[in-house]
Amino acid sequence: MKSAGAIQKNTEKRASHDVLFSLCENAADKLILLVLLGSVLLFILWPIACIALRSLRGADGGVSFAMFGTVLRQYGESLRNSVFVGVFTAVLSTILSLSAALVCATARGWKKTLCMVIMLVAMVSPPFVSSLAYIQLYGRRGWITYRLLHLSLNPYNRWGVILMQSISFVPLNAMFLSGILEKLDEGSLRSARDLGASGGAILRDIVLPLIRPATLVCLLLSFVRSLADFGTPIIIGGRFSTLAADIYLQVVGYSDLEKSSAMNMFLLIPSIVFFFVYRALMRRSDRLTDASRTAQTELGLSLPHCGAMGWGMIALSTVFFVMIVLQYGCVFLSGFLKSTKGVYSFTLQYWDQLWRIGSSTMLRSVEYALIVSIAGTVFAMLFAYYMDRRRIIGRSLFDCLATLPYMLPGTCFGIGYILAFNHAPLKLTGTALIVLANMLFKQLPTSTKICTASLALLPEVQERSARDLGAGRLAVLRDVVFPALRPAFLSCFVYNFTSSMTTAGSIIFLIDAKRQLAVFKLFDAVYQGDYALASLIASVITVIVLFVEGLAFLITRKGENRRVSRT
C-alpha cells in the first residue's frame, strides 16, 4: 500500500496540474474572445473607416469636402438615376415578394413544393443570370420578342434594369416573408373566421398588419440592394447609368480611389441609416410574431376566398413564377444549343470551351467556397456563443458591427478592403486571403443569426450544470454547445457555400487576374456578348450549389431519422 505521504504528493501534483490546466483554459478562452472581437474591428469597422477617411482627404493631405462637390457635379444624374431605380425596384419587388410569399404560405401539396423549388433555384443561381436571360428572351433577337412576336425592341433602358432587379430580389424577400407568415398565430385567424370575418377581411385586417414590419424590411433591403447593384445597369442599362455602375467603372478604368470613396459615401450613409431602421423593424416583427414560434406547414387562409386582393396576388405570383421558369429554362438550354441560320441544334462545343478556359476557375471557386464555409461557420458559432451567452461588455456594439455588412453595398465593402489592406503592416491585396476574408465577413451577419437562433433552443441550465460538475469554459463549449449547434453548422455551411459561389459585388475589386473565380468569368462572358458560354457557366454553378444543398438535406434527414430511432 502507498504511504500517506505518497498519496498526499500525488494529490498535490494532480491539484497543481488541474490549476495549470484551468489557467491555460481560461487564457485560451480569453484569446478566442480577443481574436473574435479584434477580427470584427479589423475586417468590418476598419475598412468602413478607411472609406470615410479617404473621401475626406484633400489635395494637400488635410480634411476637405471638395470631392463631394465634384461627385455631385459630375455624377448627380447617376445619383438621381440610382434613387429612381431604387424606389421603383423596391416597390415592385416588395409587391411581387408579398404575393409570392402568400401563395407559398397558403398553397398545399405539390403546388407548395413546386413554388418552393422554383424559388430555391432562383436563390442559389449566380448573379447576372436575370440580365443574361433578359437579353436572350426579350432582346433585339430575343426568343420571345423577335422569334415569337416578330418585334425588334430596344431592351437596354432603365425599365429593363428595374424589371430585372425586381425579379432578382423577389426569391430572397419571398422566403423571408414566408418564414414570418408561418409564425403567425393560427388562433387569431380562426377567431376571426368564427366571428364571421371574410377571407379578404382577414387578409386585410389581420395578416397584412402583422407582417407590415417585415414588408418594410423587404422594401428597405430591396432599395439598398438596388443602390449597390452595378452588374445589371452595366449589362442592360445601355446609356442609362447608376452611381454603383459609375463606381465600378471609376475603379476599374481610372483607379481613382479618392473619388470612388467619395462616391461610395453617397451609398454608405443611407445604407447605415437604413441599417438601424432595419434592426428596429426586425425587433418589432419579432414581437408581432412571438405568439406562435413553431412554424406551421401552411397558413390557414385561402387566397381565392380573399376577393379581388387574393386573386390579384395569385395573378402577380403566377406571372413571376412563369418568368422565373422561362428565365432559367432559357439559361440551361442556351449552353447546349447552337443557332445556324435560325435553326437550333444540340452542341457540346461550349462545354469544351468551358473546360479549356474555365475548369481551373471553377475548381478554385469551389475551393474558396469550402474554405469560407468551414471557417465562416466556426467563426459564426463562436461569435454567436460569446455574444449571446457570455454577455461581455460592449456586446451590443459588436453585435451591431457584425450585422452591419448585411446592409453595406458590395462596392463599399470591396473598396474598403483595398484601402485598409493595401500597405504594411497588413498588406493583403493580390492574395487569396483578402478575398476569403471579405467573403467571410460579408456573410457573417446571416451565419450569426442562424447560430443565435439555434442557441436559443439550448437551455442555459445545461451549461451551468456542466460548470457545476467541474467542466471548464472550453469543455462546456466543446461538449455542450457545439453538439447542440450541429443543425446550425450545416445550415451555415450551406449558406456560406452558396453565397461564396455566387458572390460578386464585394470581391470584384479584390480578385487577382491569376486567381479568377467562375462568377467573374460569367460576368465577362455576358459583358462580351458570349451568351452561350455565360449560360453554361451559370448552369454549372447552379448545379454545384444545388448538389451541395441536396447533400446537406440528406445528411440532415439522416440525422433526424437516427435521433427518432434512438427515442
List where the protein language model places each region.
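Transmembrane alpha-helical segments of polytopic membrane transport and secretion proteins
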Residues: 1-35, 280-318, 554-567
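Glycine-rich helix-loop "coupling/hinge" segments at transmembrane-helix boundaries
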Residues: 230-254, 339-343, 504-531, 565-567
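Glycine/proline-centered hinge or cleavage motifs at structural transition points of membrane proteins
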Residues: 195-197, 209, 469-471, 483
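Membrane-water interface segments at the C-terminal ends of transmembrane alpha-helices
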Residues: 28-59, 71-182, 210-231, 262-280, ...
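Juxtamembrane inter-helical linkers in multi-pass membrane proteins
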Residues: 198, 286-303, 340-354
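Helix-loop-helix hairpin linking two adjacent transmembrane segments in secondary transporters
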Residues: 245-270
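A short amphipathic helical element positioned immediately N-terminal to and/or at the very start
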Residues: 63-72, 346-355
